[in-house]
Amino acid sequence: MATDLSVIMILTFALWVTSPLHELQSTAAFSQTTEKINSNWEPGVNVDLAVTMQRHHLQQLFYRYGENDSLSVEGFRKLLQNIGIDKIKRVHIHHDHEHHADHEHHSDHEHHSDHEHHSDHEHHSDHEHHSDHEHHSHRSHTVAGKNNRKAFCPDLDSDNSGKNPRTSLGKGSRPAEHMNGRRNIKESASSSEVTSAVYNAVSEGTRFVETIETPKPGRRTKDVNPSTPPSITEKSRVGRLSRLARKKSNESVSEPRKSFMYSRNTNDNIQECFNTTKLLTSHGMSIQALLNATEFNYLCPAIINQIDARACLIHTASEKKAEIPPKTYSLQIAWLGGFIAISIISFLSLLGVILVPLMNRVFFKFLLSFLVALAVGTLSGDALLHLLPHSHASHQHSHSHEEPAMEMKRGPLFSHLSAQNIEESSYFDSTWKGLTALGGLYFMFLVEHVLTLIKQFKDKKKKNQKKPENDEDVESKKQLSKYDSQLSSNEEKVDPGERPESYLRADSQEPSPFDSQQPTMLEEEEVMIAHAHPQEVYNEYVPRGCKNKCHSHFHDTLGQSDDLIHHHHDYHHILHHHHHQNHHPHSHSQRYSREELKDAGIATLAWMVIMGDGLHNFSDGLAIGAAFTEGLSSGLSTSVAVFCHELPHELGDFAVLLKAGMTVKQAVLYNALSAMLAYLGMATGIFIGHYAENVSMWIFALTAGLFMYVALVDMVPEMLHNDASDHGCSRWGYFFLQNAGILLGFGIMLLISIFEHKIVFRINF
């Protein structure tokens, strides 16, 4: 209601100030309008031009809704209805590809039954279905009963130099060219019809003006100079309006009161969408000027005229199915980029050979922690900033084109620019929303991590206030000696031929290169016999036997000890050995050597790597192949995300194979076999993206879900439950290192998402 009242007050004030319109025609201000307007004038207001434009817009409004230079209550009511402030309305916009639904805010059409219809309402042969909101020519019709009224239509493109340059008219001296510019036009039924429309982009930074003049069929044009080309610059437009002011000022005050309205049959009716700068400069006002009430009153008719003419509305609902433009990629780039990306990612397994000597150093633990955080940032960033927005790209593009009739009016270039601006704004809107989601994810990570650090700090402080560490060591030694005595007595009671395989010792076996880093596999199996002892004895033994094996993901292979706080790691340890026993159902009546167990473990682990990791690589290759068919920037973004999360993953797999007893050559071979599935996935993704575009959109959505799962389920818990304090490292150092990795991953994906349309690479064969 506040908006309605403000518009009514503006309109009332404008009509009150300009009510004696016939007196304004006799003022000398109109004869002194500047012929040429300099674009860099001093800050201020050109009053003459402002008054001219004010009269121009008022004349258009009075021509549409007035009668005999006056605006009746009925006409005023129709004006309010047309600008949408007569009552509260609900607007429902339906996107119908068969026929356009009429918008409720165009309900004022039913009130124009008394208008004299011109050929503006005639449908073009190539557009059989036009919605009501496409035609606003009813606003320019003459009202029934106005047959005695004459309209003035000066020819703005012709100076009529054959006439005398000066003459005297009425009470004052006026230029003769103004008299020559004035023409009497017949009734609108026999007048010429030339539709002129000038449109420019709404953006203030980019101006695009296009003039279209289309003679209506069945009408003959008259009094229009065909040799004069349409002016498309602001300077010529302002110059024409200046000549219009001088020509209109020739009307004598002593003449009988006539209509001052302009006819629509000229090029003066400029239906242009004014932005702030355009609105001020067209009225002779500097953009640095401070507007007072009088100067603002000059702008009121233009504002109301803009609302009434709906010059700034662009209907995005398309009558026909939007044509998807050809993709800006080549099949050669897709194959080349995908092959290079998969090859680089697959060669990461060789990096593990170089890092083998560093696996037991603190530096490697810090490096791996940073890589895990970087993988979380790139995976989640690629999912929310790139994959999900691209999965909605086809839907957004299908609604980004204008209606055919609007395209015909504004031209193909304007339609292309408008569609491009709408598509870019929609895409960046999705990008900012994805960035907001990443912000929420990062905030919760910070909260949980900080709370964990605070809790660990308090626990450490309480622990230091208890018994000295020496007393604790003495007590632990007593418990271990007690357990050893119980274990030796139990071994004497068991027949050597009936001992389970869990009792196998590694004393007679040759030590492995990794025996110094962690207990042997046979020592791991001893944990499973703990059910034969009291619970307290089991609890005493677990910290020793579970050392370096209770950690999840790939850190359990890198010689890291675990903290007793994480009881779920103990449970994970039990499940791991239960799974191992199910896959090795050996008889308990036999003794197996370490080499036999190692060989069986290698075979099982090799298949796990080839099938499990190979399936993961296939999904990565599928995503990379489909992304490269979307464009080089899209493929680059997905490749970076896959690279960052495969880097720690491949290092972990390589370490698992080596610690299981494989040689370096065997580990490299099995990783290479799993990488072959990545090439197969890449080829599948390229074929799908090239021949079935709609399917590639679903691949993007599926890949986004996979990336989010890997980041949030596999890697974030690894970041939150690190064992830095067990190695004498600062937990806060790990915290800041992980934050740096996450933010770096977010930043990489954000930069690629924003500037991906500028990443262009072409190959000509």
Curated annotation (Swiss-Prot):
The keyword Membrane appears for this protein: yes
Glycosylation sites per record: N68, N250, N275, N292, N694
Polar residues composition bias: residue spans: 224-233, 509-519
Biased composition (Low complexity): 187-196
Signal peptide: 1-20
Posttranslational modification: Cleaved on the N-terminus before locating to the plasma membrane. N-glycosylated.
Ranges facing Cytoplasmic side: 357-365, 455-667, 718-734
Compositionally biased intervals (Basic residues): 238-247
GO function terms (MF aspect): zinc ion transmembrane transporter activity
Pfam family for this entry, one: Zip
Cellular localization per UniProt: Cell membrane; Cell projection, Lamellipodium membrane; Membrane raft; Apical cell membrane
Biological processes, Gene Ontology terms: epithelial to mesenchymal transition; intracellular zinc ion homeostasis; lymphocyte activation; T cell receptor signaling pathway; zinc ion import across plasma membrane; zinc ion transmembrane transport
Residue span of region Disordered: 96-196, 209-257, 458-519
Gene Ontology cellular-component annotations: apical plasma membrane; endoplasmic reticulum; lamellipodium membrane; membrane raft; plasma membrane
Residue numbers bearing the Phosphoserine modification: S481, S488
Listed transmembrane segments: 336-356, 366-386, 434-454, 668-688, 697-717, 735-755
Biased composition (Basic and acidic residues): 96-135, 174-186, 248-257, 490-508
Function: Zinc-influx transporter which plays a role in zinc homeostasis and in the induction of epithelial-to-mesenchymal transition (EMT). When associated with SLC39A10, the heterodimer formed by SLC39A10 and SLC39A6 mediates cellular zinc uptake to trigger cells to undergo epithelial- to-mesenchymal transition (EMT). The SLC39A10-SLC39A6 heterodimer also controls NCAM1 phosphorylation and its integration into focal adhesion complexes during EMT.
Complex and partners: Interacts with SLC39A10; which triggers cells to undergo EMT and mitosis. Found in a complex with SLC39A6, SLC39A10 and with the 'Ser-727' phosphorylated form of STAT3 throughout mitosis. Found in a complex with SLC39A6, SLC39A10 and with NCAM1; this complex controls NCAM1 phosphorylation and integration into focal adhesion complexes during epithelial-to-mesenchymal transition (EMT). Found in a complex with SLC39A6, SLC39A10 and with GSK3B that controls NCAM1 phosphorylation.
Family: Belongs to the ZIP transporter (TC 2.A.5) family.
Protein name as it appears in the record: Zinc transporter ZIP6
Biological source species: Mus musculus (Mouse)
